[in-house]
Every structure is written in C-alpha cells, then in structure tokens.
C-alpha cells in the first residue's frame, strides 16, 4: 500500500495452521516463499519521469534499485496493492486526477505496465491494501474534499471497473494502508487536522463500513506503511517526521507503539517489504532516493539505510509479491 498497501496475501486460510497463518501470506504451506523476491517503488513526483518503476532486490538490498518496465501512464500520489503475481497501481495524478489502474507483472517486469481497470472515481493521495483475491483502494481526494470510499478490484476480473464496497469511518486523504490475511488497516491521513485514526476493513464482510480501532501514537499524514503477519509499521509524516509506529494485529484496539525511527525525517514516501523487513523509500523534503530498512525482529533501533533508489522521488507508491 500502500501505499501500502499490503501485497502478496496468497495462502488459503482453511489450509493452514494458526501458526502458519500468523506468517505473512507470501509464504506457502511449507513456509516456502511465494512470488519473486523484489519490492517495487512506482512513479512519483518530478523532476523526471513519473512512469518509472524501481525494483529493490531483497537478497541484495545494498545495491541501487534497478529501473524496470515503466507504467503505461505515469503518475504521482498513486496507491498500490497486489498479490503474488501482479501489482496494481491506482489513481493519482496522470497528469490530472485519474481513475486509471495499471498492472505490473512480476514475472515480466521489464515490460510496460498496462492500464487494466479503473476506479469508480478519480482520486489522488489514496491508499491500497489487499489479500490474494482482491485489492482495496480507500480514501484520497477526488476534489475538492476528502473521500471515504473504498473500491474493490477483483484480480480474477481485473479489466472491470472497481466496485465501491465500503466506506472509511473517517473520510481523509494522504493516508496509508497495510494488513494481514483477514483485515486491511487504513491509518493516519489528513481530514483538516492530521489524524491518528486507524480504520479496520474486514475482508470477510467488506460491504460494511470500516471500524475505528486503536490509534497511532502520533498524528501522521503523507506517511507510508508496511508489515508482516503480526505487525503493521507506519512511518514518516509531514512536518517532516522520522517517526515509526507499530500496530499489533493481535491487540488492534490498543494505541500503536513508537518504535525505532527512520534514518532521516521525511514525508510523501512509500513502503513495502517481506516477512522479515520493511523498506521505506523516497519522499520529501525535495525528492529523496533514501531507502531505510526496518528489521521486524529487532524494531527498536534506528532503521538502516540500504541501497538507494536509482531516481529520487516523492509522492510515490510501493508494492511487492512478498509483502
């Protein structure tokens, strides 16, 4: 997501033990990783090409991200979500407020990412999250006010227009999203003042309005989020901030806990990751190429700077088959 958006939720819940379900859904029944081992940072603000797709190799994350196949229609302020096969990049400025949803094929990522579907309404600064069957794109600004709409994209029918399935409890823009196999969480954002709100979407009852859960410890907007099967990590914010908050999915009515910060204060960034690490990339002031890695197993120290983006960007999104 989104983004974060959560991408790569692929395990069938009724086929897995509770222990395995607590892993992120980018692992199969035998906990063998599913999907290619990369994260993708997509689009972003000028200067430069808004269609750029930059790939981080998790197995070699000190290297500079590699430029891959571009978006058919470049964009900034998009949202991203996906499964183990495809990443979907929705909305944004392309160059005006857009309904476009582009699809990145992880197994053919040097190809142009084509336009596949459309949102029910054009929006910028929205957030994306999903499971193995659907992506959900929520919030944002269609202009002139914030939106509460949550659109659902069916991966099995991804050329159709998305359906409005739910609404956020609080309409807002510049929010982030992340989730596990059961729920999507939309956090922070701007609805006049910055918000601490975290709304939870129940995938099994996705026509219901989202439910407000435990809040962020700090009001945050223009933030990013990623996580694993147990925790969500929310990082960065306008001011800018280096803040990272952690939500425990097993206790999601409690306030998020402050964890180790990013290496540099920033906003308008993106995040993605795998079961072990979260990668927070790009952002502002100006446009930044920094990628910070958060170690989920040791999340109280300051994040570690890893290989940078090949092109500095702000207002970008991110997605991964391993998230």
How would you describe each model-predicted region?
Residues 1-323:
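Polar, enzyme-active/binding microenvironments
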